Amino acid sequence: MNLYDVIKKPVITESSMGQLEAGKYVFEVDTRAHKLLIKQAVEAAFEGVKVANVNTINVKPKTKRVGRYVGRTNKVKKAIITLAADSKAIELFATADAE
């Protein structure tokens, strides 16, 4: 698996934006990726970033109905990335204070 295929997109929620002050960033990642691969991918994608810790969450698919048709949402894997104290911040998550 290529390192640039590991990170799919950032997760922008009220909870994830509240964790930015603590140096924690939330990304949706490939379901096959393990913690070491996620760490390498973040450090390769963002220059000057040092990862201290990686926590992962597997979100199960939910059953959804549209009329009489029943389907399921896709399963998702989220990664909570904690940056080291001497690391640069990830510029992808620009806050309103910076503008």
UniProtKB/Swiss-Prot annotation:
Coiled coil: none annotated. Gene3D superfamilies: 3.30.70.330. The keyword Ribosomal protein applies. InterPro entries: Nucleotide-bd_a/b_plait_sf, Ribosomal_uL23-like, Ribosomal_uL23/eL15/eS24_sf, Ribosomal_uL23_CS. One of its GO terms (cellular component) is ribosome. It holds the Pfam family Ribosomal_L23. The keyword rRNA-binding applies. GO terms for biological process: translation. Keywords: Ribonucleoprotein, Ribosomal protein, RNA-binding, rRNA-binding. One of its GO terms (molecular function) is structural constituent of ribosome. Belongs to the universal ribosomal protein uL23 family. PANTHER family: 60S RIBOSOMAL PROTEIN L23A. One of the early assembly proteins it binds 23S rRNA. One of the proteins that surrounds the polypeptide exit tunnel on the outside of the ribosome. Forms the main docking site for trigger factor binding to the ribosome. HAMAP family: Ribosomal_uL23_B (MF_01369_B). Part of the 50S ribosomal subunit. Contacts protein L29, and trigger factor when it is bound to the ribosome. This is Large ribosomal subunit protein uL23. It comes from Streptococcus suis (strain 05ZYH33). The lineage of its organism: Bacteria, Bacillati, Bacillota, Bacilli, Lactobacillales.
